[in-house]
């Protein structure tokens, strides 16, 4: 399957292009053909959402960026992920803070995000995150036939049907998450 200038292969043909947590989670999916989900090798210099879309001629409306956030309230600290369309902004200390019922929300520190997800920074995705994390997904993405996002490794991208995203563990589909 080709999307723009990207050539995607079945995840079963290229498992080495997926981070361990992503590959392990995808292997647990029932009623999903391995050909429904694909992965493409990319130049890591163009791993960022907007850069990828421009370089590989991919429609930005099918791209998803995953942001790991750290939420705090009193002595409690927890993590969540937000998957928003490429090019979107996210209102962390307004919308997300209220949604997570936190006193403060910020981007998770880079080293902590890498350690907790076991994925490479710049390619963290919503597939295979720690089970206790809440995953907020912008409603527009679940309507897409295919969403392109990180694979957990900066050398590749994952193409997954938007309809599968709403079935990820602890996922909530949220209108207007990305602005």
Walk through the language-model features, giving the residues of each.
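Extended, low-hydrophobicity, polar/charged segments
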Residues: 1-179
């Amino acid at each position: 399957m080709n999307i723009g200038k990207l050539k995607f292969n079945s995840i079963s043909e290229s498992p080495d292009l997926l981070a361990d947590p992503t590959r392990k989670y995808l292997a647990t999916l029932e009623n999903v053909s391995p050909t429904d989900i694909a992965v493409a090798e990319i130049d890591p210099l163009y791993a960022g959402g907007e850069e990828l879309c421009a370089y590989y001629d991919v429609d930005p409306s099918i791209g998803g960026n995953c942001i790991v956030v750290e939420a705090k309230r009193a002595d409690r600290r927890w993590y969540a992920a937000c998957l928003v369309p490429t090019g979107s902004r996210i209102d962390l200390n307004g919308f997300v803070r209220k949604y997570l019922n936190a006193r403060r929300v910020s981007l998770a520190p880079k080293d902590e995000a890498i350690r907790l997800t076991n994925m490479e920074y710049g390619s963290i995705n919503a597939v295979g995150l720690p089970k206790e994390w809440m995953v907020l997904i912008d409603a527009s993405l679940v309507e897409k036939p295919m969403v392109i996002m990180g694979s957990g490794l900066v050398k590749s991208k994952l193409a997954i049907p938007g309809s599968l995203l709403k079935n990820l563990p602890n996922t909530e589909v949220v209108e207007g998450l990305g602005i």
